[in-house]
Amino acid sequence: MASENVGVCHLRINDTNPIKEDVEYEDSIKAAVRWLGFDWGPHLYHASDYFDRLYEFARHLIKAGLAYVDSSSPDEMRLLRGTLTTPGQASRYRERDVAENLDLFRRMKEGEFPDGAHVLRLKIDLASPNINLRDPAIYRIRHTTHHRTGDKWCVYPLYDYTHSISDALERITHSLCTLEFQDHRPLYDWVIERLADAGLLQRPLPQQHEFARLNLTYTVMSKRKLLELVEGGHVEGWDDPRMPTLVGLRRRGYTPESIRLFAERIGVTKSDSWIDLSVLEDCLRDELNERAERRIAVLDPLKLVIDNYPADGVEDCFAPNHPQHPELGRRPRPLHRELWIERDDFQAHHPTACFRLSTAADGRPRYVYDIPDHGAPSAAG
């Protein structure tokens, strides 16, 4: 999309959770993107690049009365949030004054509290039919070393808050997500609109667009379920050839060109649908058919003896590496007195319409010349 519109595409690593992200995780993403044939150039970013600004933006929201520190337990917050049919209820900490909220948030940053003691929540609408707008948490305490920032931080922003602001700071125009984030878009817009109104973010603001996730027949695509396979030792790892990951497909023999062709053929849609696995396989077949050099193998060999050919004779014959691309050259196929053919390609007695080698007809091995048949091949093999 970026190339078609003379734009640029950013690669951003969402490293807001130090428990889950590490250098290996990041390197595997970059390696997969490079393997597909894409280069982000100077546009590599990390959510952690913006930790200082994200923290200051959160302080602004507190000062504006749009955020508060909630000391409720996770179970209490879950009960107060309500359901799809019942509105949420206010936490008893929702009306803390600005000074207390700022002080608690500062002390959270300085490491005074254990994990889970407090969270910073936005003050939006507890009666909203969209549960994502019922005072979502945007900061949590995590006393864990971050692979890029070390121990500088023990409070970390959550994805929805970080995602929208990072897009705005990078001057993104189109932020593309899968359909599961469609209900998160109002929160995405709410955050950056409030900060833009305060002059902290520049307009025009980015827009989030959603598309359907890929569903392949006979294929488990859920990251959670694939993680269970990896952690349970049912597969060798994420690059197991049975896994539908990029590294798994690579080990299975798929090429980056075939995967890009697959993406072009199925297109982008907002409707959930299932793509037959054969479409992916056809893309690999079509891509390899264009450039793969040909080779011949005999799987069920039957010895063929040319009885009037010198026992020590060798004659060079040649086969094209690709029948449609002569520029790929030829490969030698030495002709000897003894050859091997597929057992199914011989039939001692056959009907008139049979095109196999037989005792009553001449035969011509591929890329050689006609060989008259004067007897049945030996049973060796």
Regions found by a protein language model. Give the residues of each.
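Conserved short loop/turn motifs at secondary-structure junctions
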Residues: R12-K20, P42-D52, D75, L214-N215, ...
